[in-house]
Amino acid sequence: MRLPKGIYGITDDSYNVKNHVDAAKVFLEGGVRIIQYRRKEGSIRQMLNEAKEIRKLCNQYGAVMIVDDRVDIAVLSDADGVHVGLEDAPVDEVKRRFSGIIIGASASTVDEAKEGEKAGADYLGAGSIFPSPTKPDYRILGLEGLRRVVQSVSIPVYAIGGVTLESIPAIKATGAWGAAVISGILAAKDPLEMAKRFVKAWDEA
């Protein structure tokens, strides 16, 4: 499955949306075509119910659905893939046990990017590019660091961390496949309108 270029929406329920499903709907209606369901707390039943709802929405819009961390939820909800962080399940083990699903890996250095690709990741989330309210303790990679990561691997790289509307042209100029956004869209007064603006900014950059 070809990964969509451009804006990569990550769900959250702590901003100007009702819940994770509503966040996914905002992204999709705004033109985003890859969605990550990212819930850190909650029961398996709750996560699975939300994931299945998001799966239905993604099907309606022809979008790719990724689940953060939880391989079990990804498989049970029929998601297209799973994103595993540096502290999560090893990429190669997930790849071996669940062939056929998209696997994303996190990277904050060139070495981590190369390791992720070697382990079998289908794409990378590289960052934090800028200081981020979602991940305040993360190492800052910066635009030049992002460029080095992009040049060090042959798989798609999505920039993540502190991405703003104004930073989209500079991120695209590094050769990144796309940019992951959470608060930049969901914390806006009008998240749907902001999603549309992010998508347009990428397309026109």
Swiss-Prot record:
Pathway: Cofactor biosynthesis; thiamine diphosphate biosynthesis; thiamine phosphate from 4-amino-2-methyl-5-diphosphomethylpyrimidine and 4-methyl-5-(2-phosphoethyl)-thiazole: step 1/1. Disulfide bonds: none annotated. Its EC number is 2.5.1.3. 2-[(2R,5Z)-2-carboxy-4-methylthiazol-5(2H)-ylidene]ethyl phosphate binds at residues 132-134, 162, 182-183. Its cofactor is Mg(2+). It is an enzyme of class 2 (transferase). Mg(2+) binds at residues 69, 88. The keyword tRNA processing does not apply. It holds the Pfam family TMP-TENI. 4-amino-2-methyl-5-(diphosphooxymethyl)pyrimidine binds at residues 36-40, 68, 106, 135. GO terms for cellular component: cytoplasm. Coiled coil: none annotated. Condenses 4-methyl-5-(beta-hydroxyethyl)thiazole monophosphate (THZ-P) and 2-methyl-4-amino-5-hydroxymethyl pyrimidine pyrophosphate (HMP-PP) to form thiamine monophosphate (TMP). NCBIfam families: thiE. Belongs to the thiamine-phosphate synthase family. This is Thiamine-phosphate synthase.
